[in-house]
Amino acid sequence: MNKLYCAGTFCFDFLDSNYREMAKKDYRSLVLGDSALLLQKSDYVLLNKKLKYIGPFYFESEGMVDELIVSSEVGMIRECTHAVFLLDEGCCPGTIAELILASELKKNVQIFYIRRGDSEETESKLHTPCWFPIIMSQQINHNNTKVVECKNYEEAIDNILSYVRSL
């Protein structure tokens, strides 16, 4: 059974009054098919007969305790067989740490990133502020890291959903 971990910045905060509505736009809600599944703590969600979504979930610890969130997500990354990363506007430090951990553990890593224009982020041919962790992941885990350039968030989501369906 494949086990999927989907990393990236959550596009909402539970302190916002409309966080439940905003959660519906998070790519993990689309992978799960229902934002309610993302907002509840669970060991996993069965996506099909060959694939479990094992995390992250938005509420992973009682009271949102930071140390418990980190240890929980590290455990999920250790357990997963496939790790998806959506890198868009800028990398959250937690997402970068998750990417490097998954790479060090030689997981099947799929990175979907939003490419900026040719005149932006010219330090790398990737044209993204996330170029350094992407290249580091490729160097650490070259046999198991795939990088997919996307024009925008919608294309990234389409590519992620296609990838998940292929598992």
Question: Each predicted region: which residue ranges?
Answer:
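Conserved catalytic or regulatory cores that recognize and/or transform ribose-phosphate-containing ligands
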Residues: M1-L167
